[in-house]
Amino acid sequence: MSSKNRSRQIVKLGVNKMCATTERKLRILFVCIGNSCRSPMAEAVMKNLLPGASTWEVDSAAIASWNVGLPPEERCLRILQEHGLDSNHIARQVTKADFYRFDFIFGMDPRNVEDLQRMAPADATAKIELLGRYDSERDNVILDPYFETGDHGFRRCFEQISRSCVGFLRIHGATRRCHAAAAAD
């Protein structure tokens, strides 16, 4: 085998290895303080954006316990419905197991991220970061719209979350790249 063919085979094996690792289910958890506005909205947006939901797991949870067992806030549901999205999510609180189960745990603001880092076990495997870091407009903090009057804050939140989810998928949606690389061979 020539060195050129050997190099080509190694590259092909490398692509196949990357594809194999990205073909496993990627798990994402969105977190906000109460799991009634931002995180269930992000969950609904991401689920809508994913072409092959069977290779992804998406959920949302709260840092605090006061909304556990309740559906998302009325205004959140209204904005989702305006965009043709639905949510049957019921609020839950972050658990220790989440830090091992999920690959990415996204906080909506710096306080969420600080709380998550404080809650995370020392050997946690999840990557904790701000969802807004993926926003194409560099609007890193997704503010809590709960205390705002009307729907404006929820609309702003929806736009930020949508841009951020699209940005995340552009970077981490490796399965599409794998399929494209396989087709090119």
Which residues fall in each region the model found?
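Phosphate-binding/catalytic loops
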Residues: 104, 110-185
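Conserved active-site segments centered on acidic
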Residues: 3-101, 171-180
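Hydrophobic structural packing positions in well-ordered secondary structure
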Residues: 32, 80, 106-107, 161
